[in-house]
């Protein structure tokens, strides 16, 4: 129901990841032992954090729809809107969980999730 807010929230994904990436990389030169934690370790670690973050985000979004701790953003919608929103979150979460190894870019994930949410919304 709130397309502008949804676009803003999806945009936060790329903003948050970019802030983490820049901050972590700026702190990397101060690591404990550069002989053990090489620059190759940095790239591998950031890639793993991205994969884990996408998987966790997908699981958390599913849990907030199916589990006991429902999200007020969806629960307070009118019933006809709630159904489409919940379906969209579940489908976007499934996409994130199943395709996270193919593309870990925050902007790519946000774009695909946005397309799914638009396709499943009800009016």
Predicted features and spans:
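Active-site activation/catalytic loop segments of kinase-like enzymes and analogous catalytic loops
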Residues: 1-31, 57-73
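ATP/Mg2+ or Mg2+-diphosphate-binding catalytic cores
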Residues: 10, 40-123
């Amino acid at each position: 129901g709130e397309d502008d807010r949804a676009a803003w929230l999806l945009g936060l994904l790329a903003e948050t990841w970019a802030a983490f990436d820049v901050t972590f990389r700026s702190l990397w030169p101060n690591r404990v032992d550069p002989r053990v934690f090489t620059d190759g370790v940095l790239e591998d670690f950031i890639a793993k954090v991205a994969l884990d973050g996408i998987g966790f985000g997908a699981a958390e979004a599913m849990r907030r729809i199916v589990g006991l701790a429902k999200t007020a953003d969806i629960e307070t919608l009118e019933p006809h809107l709630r159904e489409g929103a919940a379906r969209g979150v579940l489908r976007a979460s499934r996409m994130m969980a199943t395709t996270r190894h193919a593309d870990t870019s925050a902007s790519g994930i946000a774009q695909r999730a946005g397309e799914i949410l638009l396709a499943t919304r009800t009016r």
